[in-house]
Amino acid sequence: MDYIFDKFTEWIKNLLVDGIMNNLSGLFDNVNAKVSEISTQIGSTPQAWNGNIFNMIKNLSDNVILPIAGVILALVMTLDLIQLITDRNNLHDVDTWMFFKWIFKTACAVLVVSHTWDLVMGVFDVAQNVISRSSGIINGTLNIDIASHFADLETRLQAMGIGELLGLWLQSFIVGITMWALSICIFIIAYGRMIEIYLVTSVAPIPMSTMVNREWGQMGQNYLRSLFALGFQGFLIMVCIAIYAVLVQNMIVDTNVSTAIWSCMGYTVLLCFTLFKTGSLAKSVFNAH
């Protein structure tokens, strides 16, 4: 009877050890892949990230939004002319210079609207240049490999009791599900930012058509601030990833396997939290809303 019980105990222990090793071997693979992917994607301009989407958005902007922006521009400049004339003592003090001033403002407004796409892409080209230069300064591995810190991990697991192994297997399983969810969060941040860029750029002519007007100009100015916030959000993401890389490189793994698993996951949770904060931080820096 003792022989049968020992064999059953050994079988359960081997099953738990194999399960723990399998859970730990690929525990951080998805997160490592997503972190490497996001560090590459944030350095891409809208046209380089996906050419098909870029062309579609540009066609929509040129063929659908630009005519609407032209109507808004005509309305804004007409109101501006009326205000310019009535401000001069109700037409009793009209001078010809004000018409030249209005013609100059209108010409500038038409120039801005007709070159909106170039101006918008210029903002992201500047941001991409900043990110590329920062990536040359920031170095370091972004990968977490928990198994590499425990060369004798399987031997140590074999020395544990069934209760300890069962608890460790349950922890590794829970952490594995959590890491899968975190990898999805990183994916959402990377792709969500690029989709937001495409959405914002698609309507660019409308806010840009209000730039030269005193009352309506706040719309265009806030739009430009939003563009810079979106562009430089990539730089903040790069800084977050750099801090994450330093933490991973200097990670002191505890001799306790359970503590090591949770500490590694803690770094990844911290990364996700800071990545989600980059959008609001960039908007607050550029006073965009």
Predicted regions and their residues:
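Gly/Ser-rich, low-complexity
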Residues: 1-72, 88-97, 107-178, 217, ...
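Hydrophobic alpha-helical transmembrane segments
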Residues: 67-79, 197
